Every structure is written in structure tokens, then in C-alpha cells.
UniProtKB/Swiss-Prot annotation:
[4Fe-4S] cluster binds at C72, C73, C137, C167. It catalyses: a quinone + NADH + 5 H(+)(in) = a quinol + NAD(+) + 4 H(+)(out). It holds the Pfam family Oxidored_q6. The keyword 4Fe-4S applies. Binds 1 [4Fe-4S] cluster. This is NADH-quinone oxidoreductase subunit B. It comes from Mesorhizobium japonicum (strain LMG 29417 / CECT 9101 / MAFF 303099). NDH-1 shuttles electrons from NADH, via FMN and iron-sulfur (Fe-S) centers, to quinones in the respiratory chain. Couples the redox reaction to proton translocation (for every two electrons transferred, four hydrogen ions are translocated across the cytoplasmic membrane), and thus conserves the redox energy in a proton gradient. GO terms for biological process: aerobic respiration; electron transport coupled proton transport. The gene is nuoB. Its EC number is 7.1.1.-.
Length: 193
């Protein structure tokens, strides 16, 4: 039916949702989540959601982390930003300033002398803020647990959301911890935090 067709009134074709240009079929037609979205798009032509769900989705997909590397775990933390693991493909990118960060990754041995600096940096982060404790030393003191100068876990100074075990944990483990944090943000939301 073209514009010059005089057979009747012009009727717009029924939308079929998001179409994959390669296959010509709806995206994720086997996935129940995408099937629900495609059906809603086909029915109404637009999506309806709550503001909190939209904010939570946007916040979990664009997290900025600040590195607080104190020891050897920091090397593995840097690996997650390198091309092999590329944390930016998951919507997580490093930032140098705590005022622009959503996540602080504490990696390494936290000493008593460094603890006030950790708390000060944490307080400079905007709400909602999250902390990932990376490695045995940050989780509970690790190898230096019985030393007089070591804090036995950074959770004594700042509230920790995700613990990544290992000495040092691999970059895959940290990436998994970041993905768990994204899942936690989607589950709990950010407004009531």
C-alpha cells in the first residue's frame, strides 16, 4: 500500500517492537524479558515505568569507581580497566576524584595511619555511594591481621557493600564483584538507600 494507492484509508503498520537489522526478527524474541518489552512496544508504542526503576537502571549502568589502591591488589584492580577485561563495557569507568565517584574500591592493607584518609575520601563521595572491599587484607587484615598497625578489615572504617576474596583476587573476581554490585543496586534501588 503506497501513498498513491486509492483503495482506502492509510493505516500505519502495527509496530513489531525492536527489530534486529541483521535477522529482521524482534530482538530477544526467546528471552522473556525482551519479549515483554517488545509486546509493550507493539501494543502502546512506548514504555511505561516508574521513576525509581528508571533511575535505578540508569545508575546501575553508569557507575564510576575511584581506586583506593593500598598494596598488591591494586595491580589486579587496574587489570579490570585494561583491554582484556574492559570494565567500561559493563558501564563502569574509573574516576580520579571522589566527588565524581559512585564506588570506592579498597584494595590492599589498610593501616591505622591510612584509615582517617579512607574515611575522609569516603565522606567526599556523593550519595548513594558504594564500597567494594578487594582482597584478604582489605576484608579482614589478611596476612598482616595480627600486626599492631593494621586495621582488621576496612568495614570497621566504612560500610562495605561487596567483599571480593583472594590474595590477590583475580581481575575476573573483581569484575564479578562489580556485576554483583550492579545487581544489588537494581534489586534494592537507590532512593531508599
Amino acid at each position: 500500500m503506497g501513498l498513491n494507492d486509492s483503495s482506502g484509508t492509510l493505516v500505519a503498520p502495527k509496530p513489531k517492537g525492536i527489530i534486529d537489522p541483521n535477522t529482521g526478527r524482534p530482538v530477544g524474541e526467546d528471552d522473556p524479558f525482551f519479549l515483554e518489552i517488545n509486546n509493550e512496544l507493539a501494543d502502546k508504542g512506548f514504555l511505561v515505568t516508574s521513576t525509581e526503576a528508571l533511575i535505578t537502571w540508569a545508575r546501575s549502568g553508569s557507575l564510576m569507581f575511584m581506586t583506593f589502591g593500598l598494596a598488591c591488589c591494586a595491580v589486579e584492580m587496574i587489570h579490570t580497566s585494561m583491554p582484556r577485561y574492559d570494565s567500561e563495557r559493563f558501564g563502569v569507568a574509573p574516576r580520579a576524584s571522589p566527588r565524581q565517584s559512585d564506588i570506592m574500591i579498597v584494595a590492599g592493607t589498610l593501616t591505622n595511619k591510612m584509615a582517617p584518609a579512607l574515611r575522609k575520601v569516603y565522606d567526599q563521595m556523593p550519595e548513594p555511594r558504594y564500597v567494594i572491599s578487594m582482597g584478604s587484607c582489605a576484608n579482614g587484615g589478611g596476612y598482616y591481621h595480627y600486626s599492631y598497625s593494621v586495621v582488621r578489615g576496612c568495614d570497621r572504617i566504612v560500610p562495605v557493600d561487596i567483599y571480593v576474596p583472594g590474595c590477590p583476587p583475580s581481575a575476573e573476581a573483581l569484575l564479578y564483584g562489580i556485576l554483583l554490585l550492579q545487581k544489588k543496586i537494581r534489586r534494592t534501588g537507590t532512593i531508599e538507600r
